[in-house]
Amino acid sequence: MSKKYLVAYMTLGYPNVNDFYKFIDNIEDFGVDILEIGIPPKYAKYDGPVIRKTYKIVSNNIKNYYEILYEVKQRIKIPVVILTYLEEYVDKLGDFLLKLKESRVDGVLFPDLLIDYVDEYEKYVNLIKNEGIKTVLFTAPLMPDDLIIKASKLTDLFLYYGVRPTTGVVIPISIDSLINRIRTMVQSKLVVGFGLNSIEDIKKAMSVGADGIAVGTSLIEEVDKNGVNGALELIKKLRGVLDEY
C-alpha cells in the first residue's frame, strides 16, 4: 500500500515572514509530502474569502516573493509547487517561469488554466515543461471527461481535483460519487482539495480511491486562531487520518 499524499498550502509570507519560515521548517517532520505556496494575484477568482484575505495582507507587506521562495527551497527537501493564476502572468509567462526556475521551485499550478485558457492549455503546459518545471493541473467535476483524461496524462506530480467551486466554501456535494467517477478515468496520482471541510470528507475521499488531499483554508484558519503551532497540530492530525489508508 503506497503512502497517501498530504499536500499543504500556505500563502507566501503569511502571516508574516518569520512565522511563515517557522511553518516551513516544521512541516516535513509533521508529515507533509508536498508544499503549495500561493503567490498573491490581483484577482483570485477561484479562491474563497479566507485565502483572499491572506493575499491582501501579503501583497501589502512583501515585495520580493522570489527571495523568499529561494529561501524556502534551502530549508526543505519536499517538492514545492507554486499556486497562482495564469491570468496574472500570461503576457510575461517566460519571465515568470525563469524566476521560478531560479528560485528552484519544483512545480506550478494555475487553477484557471483548464477553465479560462482551455483552447490553448497544451501550449502553456509545454512552455512550463520546457523550463524544467513540473506541471500540476487542476480539474473540476464540471469539466468534460476527455479534458480530465488528457490532463491526467499531462500532469506531473499529481492531478488536482477540486470538489467545490471555490476554496473554503461549503456546498452540499457527494464527495464519494465525484471521486468514484474521476477514479475510473485517470491513472495518475489523484489529490483532492478545494473544499474538503471535515475529517469525514477526507475519509470518504480516501475510501473511494483518492491518493491524497490538499489542505489550505483550514490551515490558514488555524494560523489565525492558534498560530503556527495550531496549523502544525492540524497537519499531524490529518497525517494520522491518511495513514489509516
Curated annotation (Swiss-Prot):
Gene3D superfamilies from the UniProt entry: Aldolase class I
Pfam families according to UniProt: Trp_syntA (PF00290)
Keyword Transmembrane: no
Protein's pathway: Amino-acid biosynthesis; L-tryptophan biosynthesis; L-tryptophan from chorismate: step 5/5
Active site: E36, D47
Keywords of this entry: Amino-acid biosynthesis, Aromatic amino acid biosynthesis, Lyase, Tryptophan biosynthesis
Enzyme class (EC, first level): lyase
Annotated disulfide bonds: none
UniProt keyword Lyase present: yes
Enzyme nomenclature, EC number: 4.2.1.20
InterPro entries to which the protein is assigned, alphabetical: Aldolase_TIM (IPR013785), RibuloseP-bd_barrel (IPR011060), Trp_synthase_alpha_AS (IPR018204), Trp_synthase_suA (IPR002028)
MF (Gene Ontology): tryptophan synthase activity
Superkingdom classification of source: Archaea
GO annotation, cellular component aspect: cytosol
Known partners and oligomeric status: Tetramer of two alpha and two beta chains.
Listed HAMAP family: Trp_synth_alpha
Role of this protein: The alpha subunit is responsible for the aldol cleavage of indoleglycerol phosphate to indole and glyceraldehyde 3-phosphate.
Family, as annotated: Belongs to the TrpA family.
Name of the protein this chain belongs to: Tryptophan synthase alpha chain
Source organism of this protein record: Sulfolobus acidocaldarius (strain ATCC 33909 / DSM 639 / JCM 8929 / NBRC 15157 / NCIMB 11770)
Gene: trpA
